[in-house]
Amino acid sequence: MSKALRTLALSGLVLVGLSACVSVPRGQGSGAAVVEQISDSARQGEAARQAWLQQHPNWSFQGRVAISKDRNGGSGRIDWQQDGPRYRVQLSAPVTRQSWVLTGDTTTGAGRLEGLDGGPRSGSDAEKVLLEATGWTIPVNQMPDWVRALRIADAGAARVELDAAGRPRTVQQDGWTIDFLAWTPASADQPELPQRIEARYGEAKVRLLVDQWTVSP
């Protein structure tokens, strides 16, 4: 079987498995509006949020994700665990009981994908491994910062729009447009964190709905 046919087959298997899962609901305009003027208190609050998150590099979240490209797509559960630069991401389809695990390191960029027919795939570029195995375009090395809306302004973003609380609302970076549509409220244990994110790159789209955040002390 040719490489192209193998990629198409693997992508189809993953998307079919994920399509059996619960879908991620589309937004109904719950995101905060973009504003031109940010108050000093809002800027200070966002700076404090960023500083707190930088001091807490170990975290996890559970939620739902939908991935699509052109007319192909699927959705499923996602469990993301981050330990400094190292991550473990599990995508699962409860109905079919299929799951896929991506592990990697954002410092080196390397990654390993398990759960596909034909055995694990690994390489020095996790994004390339994922693209070749599934056909998905996902910026996995940027995702740890993106999902927390962390260091957006310092990461070479082409455009950053803020809401009235000083938080990122829309970001354009590396060809992606990321919309932060809803946030979990701050608690005694952690600051506000994104709850619903939509990212687009051409025909590729990733929609994420976080059910629970956990940040280690």
Swiss-Prot record:
UniProt xrefs under Pfam families: LolB
Any one annotated GO CC term: cell outer membrane
Source superkingdom: Bacteria
InterPro entries: LolA/LolB/LppX, OM_lipoprot_LolB
GO BP terms, alphabetized: lipoprotein localization to outer membrane; protein transport
Membrane topology: Lipid-anchor
Record protein name field: Outer-membrane lipoprotein LolB
Predominant location category: membrane
Lipidation (N-palmitoyl cysteine): 21
Signal sequence annotation: 1-20
